[in-house]
């Protein structure tokens, strides 16, 4: 009975801590590196962005962060205050990117103007914020002030945001004390802007000449609060080059594997995550890049991480269906060219 109570307390603890946080992502400072594999001699292609002054392109970026907890049995000993569900946020931002200038290294200064925004936040399945700039009734929401606002960034040919040049006017416009105003301000933070405009699939600029069949990689780490931290090596492989409407489209696919990168720091966080040590863990982390080699623009990039933990009562009262908690974390990012 004592062990059942401990399991119940663990379930309640998970809900209080895990679900009230969306987790965070820490991109490693190490740039993507190309791994050259033996193969037939072919002409390599340059996997890089190209920028032209005055050129304007519209993109849609979607990020999704979700944590969920589900009680996996009908065990009558389930804590009375247990309430599973999903906690997280999904953000969809449509913006124009107008190139203002370029330099001899291939970097560009780009003016970003927000055109549309959708923002959905949940806590244990309860919607805490739901905004859609296309809905007339949302016109008075402080988040609507973001529409039409601009900021300026420097972007490298390898798809990295090297500098946030100016976002002062946009930040001043959305300033306020309400929850929606603070959310709007957060969407203009350096961290969120960097994530929004970074193309994580491209190799480093000095290793961007790639043959079909070759691979390159980068490291990305995630913190899952009470479930600890994990690092992954994202391995990209250039699968093929297609001719589409007079354009050459490079297609690369990503498969990620657990990495020992930053092992010491990750071990400290993992050691404190006692719930993770009680669970079985499964995970999938995949992605796909479509890069227009002719125009030097990303057609589409998507990546999705899904990781699950299953904690089973080691001494179940009902041997045929032991009490269990299933916790799932989803982290996804996508960018697609609209026009």
PLM features per residue range, with description:
Residues 20-23:
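C-terminal motif of bacterial Sec signal peptides marking the signal peptidase cleavage site
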Residues 25-339:
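Signature of exported/secreted
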Residues 1-13:
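Bacterial N-terminal signal peptides that target proteins for export
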